[in-house]
A protein has these predicted regions:
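A generic structural signal for short beta-strands and their flanking turns/coil linkers
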Residues: 72-74, 96-98, 107, 133-137, ...
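N-terminal glycine/threonine-rich, aromatic-flanked beta-hairpin/loop signature
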Residues: 90-130
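Cytosol-/stroma-facing membrane-proximal "stalk/adaptor" domains immediately downstream
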Residues: 120-227
């Protein structure tokens, strides 16, 4: 998200650019004529801020010293271990494989989980950096099962998840989730590709292609397809 450091930097850039424009035009820096170039300068800096918020924040040159926020963009393969008991068998369900799509800017984060039977989307989120230098993301979400399952085996519900962001890149996310239906479980996200998929079937097909195909998908980049 935009912090005081970012806002101060953009304000400072505006002032410097403004004074530079006055100097180039030969205007006295304390003259009332400073108003003339101000609109141009504000528009220019506003454009820079928009580009920075959408793309440039994730560039390596800004990592660590100016932007302290992990780049989670892309599609992750998710494994869910639920404690839900299937009433038809009396047993705990097998691990559920799905795909998590993250679209991100400096100021926003959108998370979608897609499985063969339902879709979840984030309602609110927070990313924090703990004292151990590990980032953690918390998400509140709404889950909508496929229409043919509603009223039979599953209903629309809400839940929360809490994940640790691990490795350089990062490489994976691990944590747990719980729902307002009284169920809970573990979750692991790994094997990220940079492309964002809009449905479970597309993601499933891509992740089940040969490894070389996955590399080709990754090389397409997140800049255009997964903001």
């Amino acid at each position: 998200m935009l912090t005081r450091t970012h806002i101060s930097a953009f304000v400072g850039l505006t002032i410097v650019a403004w004074l530079l424009a006055l100097w180039i035009q030969g205007q006295p820096l304390l003259s009332l004529s400073f108003i003339r170039p101000f609109g141009i300068v504000v528009g220019l800096v506003g454009g820079v801020a928009a580009v920075f918020n959408k793309w440039a924040w994730a560039w390596p040159i800004f990592r660590g010293w100016f932007v302290d926020r992990p780049d989670l963009r892309g599609t992750w393969k998710a494994t869910l271990l639920s404690d839900w008991i299937d009433p038809s068998t009396g047993n705990r369900v097998d691990p559920i494989v799905g795909y998590v799509v993250v679209r991100q800017t400096l100021a926003s984060l959108s998370v979608r989980l897609m499985t063969a039977e339902s879709r979840s989307h984030s309602i609110s989120h927070g990313i924090t950096k703990e004292s151990d230098e590990i980032f953690r993301v918390a998400v509140v979400y709404r889950n909508e099962p496929e229409i043919e399952l509603q009223g039979k085996r599953s209903e629309i519900h809400h839940g929360s998840l809490w994940l640790e962001i691990l490795g350089e890149g990062p490489k994976c996310m691990k944590g747990h989730y719980w729902t307002d239906r009284g169920t809970r479980g573990g979750m692991q996200l790994c094997d990220r590709v940079r492309r964002c998929f809009d449905c479970y079937e597309y993601a499933h097909d891509a992740f089940n292609c040969p490894e070389t195909s996955l590399e080709n998908e990754s090389q397409k980049g997140a800049e255009g397809t997964c903001p």
